[in-house]
Curated annotation (Swiss-Prot):
Native organism taxonomy: Bacteria, Bacillati, Bacillota, Bacilli, Bacillales
Organism of origin: Exiguobacterium sibiricum (strain DSM 17290 / CCUG 55495 / CIP 109462 / JCM 13490 / 255-15)
Motif ('KMSKS' region): 592-596
Cofactors demanded by this protein: Zn(2+)
Protein's name according to its UniProt entry: Isoleucine--tRNA ligase
Annotated motif 'HIGH' region, positions: 57-67
Domain of life: Bacteria
Length: 911
């Protein structure tokens, strides 16, 4: 007889190798065929809702690792909620307006000037929808489940109509106005930018000290005195109309070569050193407030510069600030208070205009040099140097931006700022610092410039009467919203103003019935920031406010910000109950991923080489709330973790062959204690994993599941129970007990890991015996039982045993290293435990089996101490059983089986 044929070895068709790049698309096709998303919604109909609202990615190009991180995090949340008692629909969205699409078309050779705006916009829309289709397939390949047949897209007519109504509501409440103010202006994009569209990069700039000679000193200063300013924007000197000082600072006159130079008193030594004025002396000291309304002479032009008090002035540089109301927010504010004009001698392209005599036609950066020369010739340039500093850049073109006063449309938040700050307190922020970050942004935030001088976007629904009066009324807004809903926003460019107005519309400022329409479009952040109105409030399966917004940390100044502004403005409430933010994905060395450096990794690469499951498991394994590093080495390490999890699942499934959980199950009370321990540990795991999911702590989910597979199962339970599973009779009570625990474990383990590893969980689900549900995602997670005192005591007892077992394993490892034994079954242990450990071991059955040795004897003392126990490892007595490999002195008691131990003899004879 071949005794190996009598062993009940593991048997399953669940493959050891995942072959994920090939097998995942098959699973996704299966989900598609069975309409899994719809089936999940039907399963959860009538349950409480949990709405995660998708922040729309920009529809341009392949998805990058930031998208991968973001979408997987969202999918984990939605899949978990859908398996844990909630109806959690997921409607993916796309942001489709804005400059990058215009630029992409122009790069593709589209000649904008050869067509109408409406025709160009049609091409933009076509391109955007192609990008949506492209990205949709990549998101689906990640395993992200959602309503892809009915996404929300910001160019959809119904979305644009809702956006117009939201704008109209804000206008009706007086929050929208037109004004000429300095805004971030991108010469490279030829458009205004919002703060959310700015990123800071290092830039080398000219830094100059300039002297402004006093014209009218008000009997305080002399005509030989000069105010000394320092600036890194020489090109703004032609726009100078004033000088700001602080009423809180004292100023001193530096006397040098017969002239006086006014700077903040505390900065005198610094300025003297910077200018190299050896021998300069310090004269009279003044209060800054005394300088108000003194007049200085502009260093280049025949006009005055008014000295003003500014609360923005600090004891830095010289303590005297060059003020150009057309080129700075504080400059504008102070200038308005003192009645100064708003001079802005720079055009849309960043070129100096005729209002800057001597520099007309120069690009502003090129003008820096010429202005420096002119100042030197005028005797006003005290020093020129160059500095490297952090400077605002256009986030799309990566080119520097300027502050430039232009007529723009603004959304004012001052009337509801307090409500916003109150609402921020009501939201759950993960991480908690998000609350402080957004609070500080709104506390100090100025008005939001919402107009853009571009073609591809939602037009501002504003008309102008014959005398220039702005027309925004509930009637016109309602009519435009209806037109957009029916025809899309391109109708604005296809029809004349009069044809866009309600029939028979009149206005006293247009006696001849002539109207013009606004040519600016809305900031794209107004588009996505309207999604709570255009999606949450309009789609029947969704609700406002959403339970969760989950995006990258850059969205504190982006989508979290614009959504909160528009929602509080129109509803008085935040659009979200909770906000979770994640960091950026960096390369393996902690550098920003950049095509120019060549250090980018695309999700599609990871999926082709390793599979989406590996990318998803990586997402769960990192501290996503901070910046995370991604390299091929990271993914190789995660692949190894995945292999261990998969092998654990395979072992569990492989030992359930012929097990019927309805008839073979052993009741909990009848399980041997070691099996009760593992079953109780499983219950404890359910509680811990669900708590981690609820706290959005996916790294803890990963660690709990991985450690349970590797430490609790593979290294302990699955290791010692092989002796039961393979050796005992098929229906032996001990074997059925282990199978009962294994069945519950594999079902629970697959359910707990399903939100993170959906392909693997659903693949394995098909091989769980007796399962009738078509997909694991149509099941619900088990409830986490409350841990009883008895259960906790059981876990504590067996945890103590596992500490003892670790000590035994150390002793066995040393014996193996000394060639005393090979496999542990070749060993006999002499144990000399202390009283506490002795008492513990006295209550534990089948100690040899648990420790996987052939014999154990308790002795008074042993060779070496390990923890609480003296342990001697000897060669086992007797001979090796051919079937179970245990050493026994009782081999061959049955002459028919001379090489078998009594246990194996009994099993074989029963077959």
């Amino acid at each position: 007889m071949e005794y190996k044929d009598t062993l009940l070895m593991m048997k399953t068709e669940f493959l050891m190798r995942g072959n994920l790049p090939k097998r995942e698309p098959d699973m996704q096709a299966r989900w598609n065929e069975m309409n899994l998303y719809e089936a999940v919604q039907e399963k959860n109909a009538g349950k409480p809702t949990f709405i995660l609202h998708d922040g729309p990615p920009y529809a341009n190009g392949d998805i990058h690792m930031g998208h991968g991180l973001n979408k997987v995090l969202k999918d984990i949340v939605v899949r978990y909620k859908s398996m844990n008692g909630f109806r959690s629909p997921y409607v993916p969205g796309w942001d489709t307006h804005g400059l990058p699409i215009e630029t992409a078309l122009q790069k593709a050779g589209v000649d904008r000037k050869s067509m109408s705006v409406a025709e160009f916009r049609e091409l933009c829309a076509k391109y955007a929808l192609e990008q949506v289709d492209h990205q949709r397939e990549q998101f689906k390949r990640l395993g992200v489940l959602g309503d892809y047949d009915n996404p929300y897209i910001t160019l959809q007519p119904e979305f644009e109509a809702a956006q117009i109504r939201l704008f109209g509501d804000m206008a009706n409440k007086g929050y929208i106005y037109k004004g000429k103010k300095p805004v971030y202006w991108s010469p490279s994009s030829e458009s205004a930018l919002a703060e959310a569209e700015i990123e800071y990069q290092d830039k080398r700039s000219a830094a100059i000290y300039v002297a402004f000679q006093v014209m009218d000193g008000k009997n305080i200063l002399e005509p030989t005195d000069h105010f000394v300013i320092w600036t890194t924007t020489p090109w703004t000197i032609p726009a100078n109309l004033g000088i700001s000082v602080s009423g809180e600072l004292t100023y001193a006159r530096i006397e040098h070569e017969g002239k006086g130079y006014i700077v903040a008193e505390t900065l005198v030594p610094e300025v003297i050193e910077a200018l190299g004025w050896e021998g300069a002396t310090i004269g009279r000291v003044f209060d800054g407030a005394d300088f108000e309304y003194i007049k200085a002479k502009h260093p280049l032009y025949d006009r005055e510069s008014l000295v003003m008090l500014g609360d923005h002035v600090t004891a830095e540089a010289t303590g005297v600030v060059h003020t150009a109301p057309g080129h700075g927010e504080d400059d504008f504010r102070i200038g308005q208070a003192y009645g100064l004009d708003v001079l802005c001698p720079v055009d849309d392209k960043g070129v100096m205009t005729a209002e800057a005599p001597g520099f007309e036609g120069l690009f502003y950066e090129d003008a820096n040099k010429e202005i420096g020369v002119a100042l030197e010739e005028a005797g006003a340039l005290l020093k020129l140097s160059f500095i490297k500093h952090s400077y605002p850049h256009d986030w799309r073109t990566k080119k520097p931006v300027i502050f430039r006063a232009t007529p723009q449309w603004f959304a004012s938040i001052k009337d509801f700022r307090a409500e916003i700050l109150d609402e921020i307190k009501e939201v759950q922020w993960v991480p908690e610092w998000g609350e402080t970050r957004l609070h500080n942004m709104f506390k100090d935030r100025g008005d939001w410039v919402i107009s853009r001088q571009r073609a591809w976007g939602v037009p501002l629904p504003i008309f102008y009467a014959e005398d220039g009066t702005e027309i925004v009324t509930p009637e016109t807004i309602d009519h435009i919203a209806n037109l957009f809903a029916a025809h899309g926003s391109n109708v604005w460019y296809e029809r004349e103003a009069v044809d866009l107005l309600p029939e028979g519309f009149t206005h006293p400022a247009s006696p001849n019935g002539i109207f013009k329409k606004e040519t600016d479009i809305m900031d794209v952040w107004f588009d996505s920031g309207s999604s709570h109105a255009g999606v949450l409030a309009t789609r029947p399966e969704l609700e406002r406010p959403a339970d969760l917004y989950l995006e990258g940390s850059d969205q504190y100044r982006g989508w979290f910000n614009s959504s909160l502004s528009t929602s509080v403005a129109t509803t008085g409430k935040a659009p979200y109950k909770a906000v979770v933010s994640h960091g950026f994905v960096l390369d393996g060395q902690g550098r920003k991923m950049s095509k120019s450096i060549g250090n980018t990794i695309a999700p599609i690469q990871i999926m082709q080489q390793f599979g989406a499951e590996i990318l998803r498991l990586w997402v769960a394994s990192v501290d996503y709330q901070s910046d995370v590093r991604a390299s091929m080495d990271n993914f190789k390490q995660v692949s190894e973790s995945y292999r261990k999890i998969r092998n654990t699942v395979r072992f569990l499934l492989g030992n359930l062959d012929q097990f019927d959980h309805t008839t073979h199950r052993v009741a909990f009370k009848d399980l041997p204690e070691s099996d009760r321990f593992m079953r109780t540990k499983l219950d404890q795991l359910v509680g811990k994993v669900k708590a981690a999911y609820d706290a959005y702590d996916f790294m803890a989910v990963y660690q709990l599941l991985h450690n349970f597979c590797v430490l609790d199962l593979s290294s302990f339970y699955l290791d010692y129970t092989k002796d039961i599973l393979y050796i005992e009779k098929e229906d032996a009570p001990a074997r059925r007990a282990v199978q009962t625990v294994m069945y519950d474990t594999v079902v629970t383990l697959l359910q707990l890991m399903a939100p993170v590893l959906p392909h693997t969980a659903d693949e394995a689900w098909e091989f769980v015996p007796g399962v009738e549900t078509a997909s694991i995602f149509l099941t619900d997670l088990p409830e986490a039982p409350e841990m009883t005192e008895e259960g906790l005591a059981l876990i504590a007892k067996w945890n103590s045993f596992l500490v003892f077992r670790d000590d035994v394993l150390k002793a066995l490892e040393e014996a193996r290293a000394e060639k005393l034994v090979g496999k542990t079954l070749e060993a006999k242990l002499l144990l000399a435990p202390n009283d506490e450990t002795k008492a513990l071991l006295a209550t534990i059955d089948h100690l040899e089996q648990l420790l996987q040795v052939s014999q154990i004897e308790f002795v008074a003392s042993a060779e070496k101490s390990y923890g609480t126990t003296g342990i001697t490892v000897l060669k086992a007595d007797g001979e090796k059983c051919e079937r179970c490999w245990t050493y026994s002195t009782e081999l061959g008691q049955d002459p028919a089986h001379p090489t078998l131990c009594p246990r194996c003899t009994e099993v074989v004879n029963s077959l």
